[in-house]
Each structure stands twice: as C-alpha cells, then as structure tokens.
C-alpha cells in the first residue's frame, strides 16, 4: 500500500499531499486528481471500460512524478469493476474504501441499512458537509436518483431512491406497445406548455417526476429537521435540475471530494490523530 504524505495546514487540518480518486458508479466512473486537497482534474468514463479507467489512472500517476507519490483510492457500487481495476496494479497499490479503510460517517441507519447503503451515497454526504458545513439534501442524479438528508452536524439520516430519468424513459418504452425509445433531453425552461406530442410529453413527465420528487422530499426533510436545508445536486444527469430554483449548488465531482475527505479521515484515525 502507498505510504501517504500528510500535510498539516491551517487549523491543524491534515491533507494528503496527492491523491488519485476513483468513484465507480453503475454506468459511469469518475476519476479525479487532488493536490493538497485542491482538485486538479476530473473526468468520467463508462464503468464497463476498465482499460480506459486503468489508463487514465496511470496517466495521472505520471502527472504526479516529481511532485509526490500519490495515494490511489477507489470506492463505488460496482464490485466487479473495482476488483478488475485493483488487480491491474501491484498488490496494495490501490486502497479500497470500505475494505482497506473505513468510510467514517455518523448515521442513524438501521443495522440492515448500514450493511446495504451504497458507498456513493455516503461519499456524497461526506463531500457535501465538508464543502457547506450545514444541513443538506444531496441529490445524486444518475442511473438512479437519490435524495439524502445530512443534518447540521454532518449526520447521515438516509433518504430516498428512485429511478433515474433514463431508467424511466427505458421502462416506459419496454413496458408499453406504443411509447418510443428516447434519450433524455432537457425541456425548454421558458415554456409552460403541456407536451404537444408523445416524445415531449414523456420528457416533460420524467422531468416533473424527478424535480417534483426532490421538492416533495426536501419539504419532508425540512419538516423533520425543523429548518430548510441547502439542496445540492451532483451526478451525470444533474442538468435535470439546472432550471430548478430549489437547487442551490451543483457539484459534479462531489463524490470524489467525499472520497478524498473519507480517505484522509480514515488515515488520521489509523494514525491516532482524530480528535
């Protein structure tokens, strides 16, 4: 396993000198580089394309030559892809969160929920609280859409999981005779017209489903929290919410930020430096 270089910065906050973070999703994998906690690159590739994932990681390793020996950390919801990426490097070269290092976050999940919660949800929660230091609803729009609640102390309370817009469109096509196969396109934000043809009606419907669900859930969480949380969007389909005034912040690499913070937090725990 790589031995990380830890820098101590302002307010005694420790950061890894350099990190290559890999977040493996159901459909897409994000790869990011961090130098002293600052993001220096962010890209994504199909999760099935493990050769490209490995190549992109190796390219980033070369980019750090002469700077420091980077920590390489991987997490996600696609175990077979994670296994293949890990096996492409020397044993111990790639740290696997949840196995080699814990994902440390306070939560109120049940025992079953703790066992089955997706790493992507936990990492996005860690990333959101790290960035905003307040109660948040984190909306991750990908193959599925999740809307999770983190309170003002950074405690993860769980949330909701629903089909992503692509899954909705695919399901309508596959489960009916007449509805066509469509790729998601953003609807015109300046128009309040009903859908005038089947395709536009389907796009309007899935947009309303996603945006309406997030609004309903946010109101539910606000009542639970007795205060209105900040709404943060991430994920490959975050563009769904670009015209929704409810969503205050868009952070495409939120999961990578959370992965970095979780990695640093776990290493500090290993070193006995955590307060």
Label each PLM-derived region with a short phrase.
Residues 124-126, 130-133, 158-203, 262, ...:
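Glycine-rich phosphate-binding loop plus the immediately following alpha-helix
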Residues 2-39, 128, 134-156, 172, ...:
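Gly/Thr-rich phosphate-binding beta-strand-loop-beta motif of the actin/hexokinase/Hsp70
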Residues 71, 77-132, 244-265:
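Glycine-rich phosphate-binding loop and adjoining helix at the ATP-binding site
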Residues 93-175, 207-217, 274:
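Phosphate-binding/catalytic loop of phosphoryl-transfer enzymes
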Residues 43-45, 189-227, 237-240, 247-248:
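Adenine-nucleotide phosphate-binding core of ATP-dependent small-molecule kinases
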Residues 38-84, 166, 204:
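N-terminal phosphate-binding loop and adjacent alpha-helix
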Residues 224-275:
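Long hydrophobic alpha-helical segments typical of transmembrane helices together
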Residues 66-78, 95-97, 225-236:
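Short glycine-rich phosphate-binding loop at a beta-alpha junction
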């Amino acid at each position: 396993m790589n031995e990380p270089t830890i820098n101590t910065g302002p307010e005694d906050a420790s950061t890894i000198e350099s990190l290559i973070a890999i977040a493996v999703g159901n459909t897409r994998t994000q790869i990011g580089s961090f130098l002293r906690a600052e993001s220096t690159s962010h890209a994504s590739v199909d999760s099935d394309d493990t050769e490209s994932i490995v190549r992109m990681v190796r390219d980033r390793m070369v980019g750090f030559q002469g700077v420091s020996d980077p920590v390489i950390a991987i997490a996600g919801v696609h175990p077979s892809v994670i296994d293949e990426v890990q096996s492409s490097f020397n044993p111990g070269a790639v740290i696997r969160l949840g196995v080699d290092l814990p994902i440390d976050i306070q939560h109120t999940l049940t025992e079953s929920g703790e066992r089955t919660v997706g790493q992507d949800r936990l990492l996005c929660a860690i990333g959101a609280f790290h960035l905003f230091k307040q109660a948040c609803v984190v909306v991750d729009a990908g193959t599925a859409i999740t809307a999770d609640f983190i309170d003002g102390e950074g405690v993860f309370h769980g949330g909701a999981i629903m089909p992503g817009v692509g899954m909705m469109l695919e399901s309508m096509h596959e489960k009916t005779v007449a509805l066509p196969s469509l790729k998601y396109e953003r609807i015109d934000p300046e128009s309040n017209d009903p859908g005038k043809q089947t395709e536009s009606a389907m796009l309007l419907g899935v947009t309303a489903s996603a945006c309406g669900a997030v609004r309903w859930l946010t109101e539910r969480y606000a009542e639970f929290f007795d205060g209105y949380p900040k709404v943060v969007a991430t994920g490959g389909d975050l563009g769904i919410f670009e015209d929704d005034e409810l969503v205050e912040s868009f952070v495409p690499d939120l999961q990578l930020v959370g992965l970095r913070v979780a990695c640093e937090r776990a290493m500090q725990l290993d070193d006995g430096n955590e307060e």
